[in-house]
């Protein structure tokens, strides 16, 4: 004889925590706040991307992989609890790559 399931098992306690999301310390267009980073992002963006990847703790070749920079930027947002979305990350890196790289480099300098 089988007994019908009338309710699903539930957790006795729920632990919920909220983390406060913050903004990037500098804006996307604040490139001139750090002139060496600005120059590197303008004239050697792949070198800056490799440095960002290395400083973030990833392989320095990650920016050369498809989606590598996107995953680093998204990982940076998640690690530092910066508000935004994958779509915003994609748009920043697709339409304004040098500015996005400079913003990421400045954020790492400030946070580390």
Swiss-Prot record:
Taxonomic superkingdom: Eukaryota
Pfam families noted in UniProt: PLAC8
Annotated tissue distribution: Abundant in the cervix. Moderately abundant in the uterus and fetal skin. Expression is markedly increased in psoriatic skin (18.5 fold increase in comparison with normal skin) and its overexpression alters the protein composition of cornified cell envelope (CE), but does not affect keratinocyte differentiation. Expressed in the granular cell layer of epidermis in uninvolved psoriatic skin and in the psoriatic lesions it is found in the upper-spinous layer.
Example GO BP: keratinization
One cellular component term from this protein's GO annotations in UniProt: cytoplasm
The keyword Cytoplasm is assigned to this record: yes
InterPro entries, per database record: PLAC_motif_containing
Subcellular location, record wording: Cytoplasm
Keywords: Cytoplasm, Keratinization
Similarity annotation: Belongs to the cornifelin family.
Function of the molecule: Part of the insoluble cornified cell envelope (CE) of stratified squamous epithelia.
NCBIfam families noted in UniProt: A_thal_Cys_rich (TIGR01571)
PANTHER family reported for this sequence: DUF614 FAMILY PROTEIN-RELATED
Record text on subunit structure and interactions: Directly or indirectly cross-linked to CE proteins loricin and involucrin (IVL).
The protein's name: Cornifelin
Taxonomic placement: Eukaryota, Metazoa, Chordata, Craniata, Vertebrata
Gene that encodes it: CNFN
